[in-house]
């Protein structure tokens, strides 16, 4: 290990899932690391439904036991509902055969596909206040130093040992480290500072969400095994949907997601907007009106972006600090955890060799870019032509390939075949006005977003 003199080996900005898992990985490997978190945990946070690829990280970090003891609702799969059933099943498609008579529409159970390295058929829905606190405490127990209530103002990254700067009692002070990890989430501390953040030109979604008690979420279950599924309810408004995520037996998180152009301008009208949107699904409205709202509404705005660079000399970005892709498939926490899983290996290598240049983090950079690109392409096709997703899920030849993506297994070297197939189908539908699905195309263009890096 290099014997360069700094206050700590690795400075980590942010103690959410990305920062806490990074700290836990490094501390477990005996690396001296410090987390600076601006909030005092527990604090509320959006992003409550996990995907199963998170389990590998929990297992690596000896954290699965904590997840089990905490009694978070188990998530066995996902279901989708729409106001009127789209004409999914009536169309024939060259290359897709008879639909499998045994599948029961647009829902999936994780147990249908074995996942290497994941030995349970469920993942979890989490109260993020509690989950993030537990993971950060776990990192601390493994040996990471954790400072809450410390907001990092900037990082000096000029090629030499980075200095993490923050104010204590009105005075700027700092900590030097060999490598700095930005895990500041959508605040993207380093991305803003270095001016390398690129707004996503395709996705400009907004969300408004809250928690309800005594909402009868079983209404949507087709059978008992779907208890505690996540449900995505489509609205008859372009690119708009509602999430339904179990938080406890009695509490359910509900969020409306829509495009910027649909979103209300003022706070009051946003609450009205929430209820009007829910009202476009009278079946949902009736159930929610009968329930008790137990938290104020929270909003998340225009959140999709990428970075021109996610690693540099002596710095790395993990989780949302490096990229945000639309959350329709509950991907964010899994990407955050897995980015730390991949990145910490390169950091260990750099500390061992003393080579802290950008090249030292190449494996991480290429792996995480590949994974998020797969998610991104999948999400884009999905928004462009929802019906295609349902069609693939109900075709037994493709069902498991789609499930693999939804389980969060997106980091293989080769692009998933099903994505190429979906993309080519979208192109054909776009070019054929007479095609029965043409009128179902949504207004997000299929490949409008072309990263320039
Ligand atoms: C509408 C919406 C719905 C979503 N739904 C889901 C979902 O169902 N499932 C899912 O997996 N994901 C979902 N996500 C995404 C999920 O919220 C994020 O991907 C996830 O929280 C990323 O973790 P992170 O650790 O990178 O960032 P965060 O969880 O945001 O953590 C970053 C931490 O850094 C701290 N911080 C920020 N700036 C500083 C600073 N200057 N100094 C010190 N500390 C700082 C913050 O206080 C915060 O605690 C959703 C996101 C949105 C917007």
Where does each model-flagged region fall?
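C-terminal helical "tail/cap" subdomain of flavin- and related membrane-associated enzymes
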Residues: 345-453
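N-terminal Rossmann-fold NAD(P) dinucleotide-binding loop
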Residues: 19-20
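N-terminal FAD cofactor-binding segment of flavoenzymes
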Residues: 45-88
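FAD/FMN-dependent oxidoreductases across multiple families
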Residues: 262-346, 350-363, 370
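Predominantly flavin-linked oxidoreductase catalytic cores and closely associated redox partners
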Residues: 138-284
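Feature captures the FAD/FMN-dependent oxidoreductase FAD-binding
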Residues: 81-179, 183, 189
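Glycine-rich FAD pyrophosphate-binding loop
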Residues: 27-46
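Beta1/beta-strand and adjacent pyrophosphate-binding region of the FAD-binding site
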Residues: 3-16
């Amino acid at each position: 290990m290099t014997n360069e003199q700094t206050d700590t080996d690795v400075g980590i900005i942010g103690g959410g899932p990305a920062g806490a898992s990074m700290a836990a990985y490094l501390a477990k490997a005996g690396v001296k690391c410090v987390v600076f978190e601006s909030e005092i945990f527990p604090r509320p946070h959006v992003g409550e439904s996990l995907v199963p690829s998170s389990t590998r990280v929990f297992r690596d970090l000896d954290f699965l036991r904590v997840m089990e003891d905490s009694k978070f609702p188990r998530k066995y799969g996902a279901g989708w509902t729409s106001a009127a059933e789209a004409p999914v099943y009536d169309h024939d498609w060259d290359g897709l055969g008879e639909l499998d008579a045994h599948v029961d529409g647009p829902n999936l159970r994780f147990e249908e596909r074995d996942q290497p390295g994941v030995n349970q058929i469920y993942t979890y829905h989490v109260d993020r206040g509690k989950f993030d606190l537990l993971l950060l405490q776990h990192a601390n127990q493994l040996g990471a130093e954790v400072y809450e209530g410390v907001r990092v103002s900037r990082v000096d990254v000029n090629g030499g040992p980075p200095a993490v700067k923050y104010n204590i009692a009105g005075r700027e002070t700092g900590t030097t480290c060999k490598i700095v990890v930005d895990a500041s989430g959508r605040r993207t501390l380093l991305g803003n500072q270095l001016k390398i953040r690129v707004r996503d030109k395709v996705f400009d979604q907004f969300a408004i969400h809250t928690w309800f008690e005594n909402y009868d979420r079983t209404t949507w279950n087709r059978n008992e095994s779907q208890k505690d599924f996540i449900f995505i309810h489509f609205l008859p408004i372009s690119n708009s949907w509602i999430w339904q995520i179990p938080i406890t037996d009695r509490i359910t998180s509900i969020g409306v997601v829509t495009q910027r152009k649909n979103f209300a301008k003022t706070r009051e009208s946003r609450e009205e907007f929430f209820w009007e949107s829910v009202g476009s699904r009278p079946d949902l409205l009736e159930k929610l009106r009968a329930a008790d709202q137990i938290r104020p509404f929270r909003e998340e705005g225009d959140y999709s972006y990428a970075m021109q660079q996610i690693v540099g000399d002596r710095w790395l970005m993990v989780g949302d600090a490096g990229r945000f892709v639309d959350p329709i498939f509950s991907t964010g926490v899994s990407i955050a955890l897995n980015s730390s899983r991949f990145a910490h290996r390169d950091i260990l290598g750099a500390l061992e060799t003393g080579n802290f240049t950008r090249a030292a983090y190449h494996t991480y950079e290429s792996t995480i870019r590949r994974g998020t690109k797969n998610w991104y392409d999948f999400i884009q096709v999905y928004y462009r032509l929802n019906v295609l997703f349902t069609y693939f899920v109900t075709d037994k030849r493709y069902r498991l390939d789609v499930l693999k993506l939804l389980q969060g297994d997106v980091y293989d070297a080769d692009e998933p075949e099903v994505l190429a197939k979906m993309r080519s189908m979208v192109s054909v539908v776009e070019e054929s006005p007479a095609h029965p699905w043409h009128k179902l195309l949504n207004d997000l263009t299929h490949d409008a977003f072309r990263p320039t890096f």
